[in-house]
Amino acid sequence: MIIQPRVRGFVCVTSHPVGCAAHVQEWIDYVKSKGVIAHGPKKVLVIGASTGYGLASRVTAAFGSGAATIGVFYERPSEEGRLATPGWYNSIGFTRAARAAGLYARNFNGDAFSDDIKKQVLDAIKADLGQVDLVIYSLASPRRTHPRTGTVHKSVLKPVGAPYTNKTVDTDTGIVSEITIEPATETEIADTIAVMGGEDWELWMHALRDANLLAPNAQTVAYSYIGPEVTWPVYKNGTIGLAKNDLERAAQALDALLKPTGGRAFIAVNKALVTQASSAIPVVPLYISILYKIMKARGTHERCIEQMQRLFATHMYNGQTPRFDETGRVRIDDLEMAPEVQAAVREIWPTVTTANLVERTDIAGYRSEFLRLFGFGMPGVDYQADVDPHIPMI
């Protein structure tokens, strides 16, 4: 079939298998162009491995350090009349490239929150790798069925305490408008922490340790975001921010767990980027469109893959210890949060309207990057060609 992008709201409901593979290959080529990451990880588990920062971490580990990787994700295969999700095609593209390079790559498609998937993954590590020396935790999920209680928790992206009104942009139509988001209830706050907080990360790490599957000096990292004050009510001080606070609590507990064997656990605070997760957050896409324009002009713009390659090469495997901030986090949002960048954002933000959106922001770059997440707009891909969307997981 011939596959074209079809965007509904903040999601593209089609994805292109050849384009997704080309996008992954572009990331692989970037990592290889930066050279070998000396003393990098060799056996890596990536929980949330099919898109965004998780996929970029897997690519960096494999093609920067020659690591064997196990990827866990929850993606939908194609069925009659329906394409697979981009993460499905991404993971196949990655796995083909890794195996062609002689690297071990194994995939588990299922609910990472469940005991069943944890057991399957632990059995695979025991059988194939013996132990892992790096665990990446990069899940972004709208819901979690708690493995102990069976309760289904659903996360929400809302402010806490009071309604929040600010500008937002419909990235499809380019209309800039005001949006008011009502505050979360106590139940919604608790549910969001249950989904996006640190409990599941702890369950994974304790299961790995109890089964003796963590190598000496093993590291684990989870990803977070802080951002500028304009996004704080809906992010840092909102429901998702409270969940990220719980993730930081878990990082400290896991760091204490790993310290006796020379390991460490920490949070990396990443840059605002166009991802399937960030596109769903009100206000944030407009901020990203402004940020991209400023950072591209300064020559400091990074995508997921540049961020993760820099995290691995200059912090985690730099021959020394990572550089931590005052609360023990690694800050690879440093270029985004540079005072002069944020001053420029604050200057542009109040002036943006529907009429001047294209001139004042990089909405074109946002849209292009958004479509690339789904395999569209990749150079060298013939989008008029007939392609088979039904590809089994490998």
Swiss-Prot record:
Binding residues for substrate: Y225
Pfam families: Eno-Rase_FAD_bd, Eno-Rase_NADH_b, Enoyl_reductase
Name assigned to this protein: Enoyl-[acyl-carrier-protein] reductase [NADH]
E.C. designation(s): 1.3.1.9
Catalytic activity annotation: a 2,3-saturated acyl-[ACP] + NAD(+) = a (2E)-enoyl-[ACP] + NADH + H(+)
Site annotation Plays an important role in discriminating NADH against NADPH: residues: E75
Gene Ontology biological process: fatty acid biosynthetic process
Quaternary data: Monomer.
Sequence positions that bind NAD(+): 48-53, 74-75, 111-112, 139-140, 244, 273-275
Keyword field contains Transmembrane helix: no
A single GO molecular function term of this UniProt record: trans-2-enoyl-CoA reductase (NADH) activity
Pathway(s) it belongs to: Lipid metabolism; fatty acid biosynthesis
Keyword flag Transport: no
Keywords: Fatty acid biosynthesis, Fatty acid metabolism, Lipid biosynthesis, Lipid metabolism, NAD, Oxidoreductase
Active site: Y235 (proton donor)
PANTHER family for the chain: ENOYL-[ACYL-CARRIER-PROTEIN] REDUCTASE [NADH]
Family per similarity comment: Belongs to the TER reductase family.
Record's function text: Involved in the final reduction of the elongation cycle of fatty acid synthesis (FAS II). Catalyzes the reduction of a carbon-carbon double bond in an enoyl moiety that is covalently linked to an acyl carrier protein (ACP).
